[in-house]
Swiss-Prot record:
Residues 1-17 form a transit peptide. This is Phenylalanine--tRNA ligase, mitochondrial. Monomer. The lineage of its organism: Eukaryota, Fungi, Dikarya, Ascomycota, Saccharomycotina. It is an enzyme of class 6 (ligase). SMART domains: FDX-ACB. It comes from Saccharomyces cerevisiae (strain ATCC 204508 / S288c) (Baker's yeast). Is responsible for the charging of tRNA(Phe) with phenylalanine in mitochondrial translation. Residues 372-469 form the FDX-ACB domain. One of its GO terms (biological process) is phenylalanyl-tRNA aminoacylation. Substrate binds at S126, A127, H128, E129, R155, T162, H163, Y164, Q169, M170, E171, E302, F329. It catalyses: tRNA(Phe) + L-phenylalanine + ATP = L-phenylalanyl-tRNA(Phe) + AMP + diphosphate + H(+). The gene is MSF1. Its main location: mitochondrion. Its EC number is 6.1.1.20. GO terms for cellular component: cytoplasm; mitochondrial matrix; mitochondrion.
Amino acid sequence: MFLNRMMKTRTGLYRLYSTLKVPHVEINGIKYKTDPQTTNVTDSIIKLTDRSLHLKESHPVGILRDLIEKKLNSVDNTFKIFNNFKPVVTTMENFDSLGFPKDHPGRSKSDTYYINETHLLRTHTSAHELECFQKIRNDSDNIKSGFLISADVYRRDEIDKTHYPVFHQMEGATIWKRTKADVGVKEPMYIEKIREDIRQVENLLNKENVKITVDDDTIPLKENNPKQEYMSDLEVDLCSQHLKRSIELIVSEVFNKKISSMIKNKANNTPKELKVRWINAYFPWTAPSWEIEVWWQGEWLELCGCGLIRQDVLLRAGYKPSETIGWAFGLGLDRIAMLLFEIPDIRLLWSRDERFSRQFSKGLITSFKPYSKHPGSFRDVAFWLPEDKPDIHQVHENDLMEIIRNIAGDLVESVKLVDSFTHPKTGRKSMCYRINYQSMDRNLTNAEVNTLQDMVCSKLVKEYSVELR
């Protein structure tokens, strides 16, 4: 059995080593033309596009998504759910429609997986934001409406226990349509609706077993986090109240689930209170903007960014000027899932090992129990940069990460820069990276590690003309 598993892994590695110098690639059943000047998506990344971990009801990411959706919709079932968007989007959807400048670093090939010049793997769920705003605008006659998007997103990144080229985001929004006050009525109906919505959320918060304690010094608004002119002071006050209580409801729900699990298992240091705090922030699509942090295991942890929707976002979605007001939020599901389920290595989220998957059940937040700890094997790759390309950016760190990831996949636990040296006489620059080869479910032999290391070194020389040391 061990031999068969090893042979399958080795075969897969050699297949992944080949780069995508082909005229077409197929992703989710659709063929796309490639471009030798632009295409940088790899076989290893394409293989992840159909995993959809956020849709698996007994996977930590799927469990968390489901808990949040159900809790938010337990108030008045306002949110339309969008969880099935495919990961390939256009540059228009991912960047242009959201106002990204042409020189924005997020567009760089060093950060983004391009299929060709016009298509890429989405880098955020906001690529579908305008479409969802348009859907709730066209489908709803109610004063209040909203949506939730969850999806896998893709970014070229470093390799360590908390970073992976694919992760999962959730974002959501709520809007209210402005209405005029009836004759003889003090406030318009939409203002009454927001007040009632706030009361409903507060009632749910009061029913939680461990009550949430909130520290909020963002009120009144600060000069560096001002309101937008299209909203009145009353609208900002009520809309921000509803936003903050809704986000607090999410935090209270998932952390109460965690605390209940800790009590059941008689865990040490089970919290007796749940403290959160609001801090001022900046985001391109909201103003004013905030972040919420939770006090957990002796430190403040950032959980979610949010704010009141900028008017230009609503206008791009087809709403008329001053027709609506609302709020939006965004959070990373993987990071919170790793925290709540006590998962030490992000690679585990992608494991197909039943020893991992059978530990989790729909609707429950339980602690991951490690089933093995195999030793790592360190290898250094040191090289001189080409003499005619002394700038380190000629070999972007994310390019090195992609070479390693595409060859070794999840058999690499981390890659770290351990030395950078410029020769005092020649001026040549040398880099040294330390690779920790460590499987999550079996021991790697020295022969396997050496083969992987040789492949990495050969590919690095071939692609970037470096000189190995």
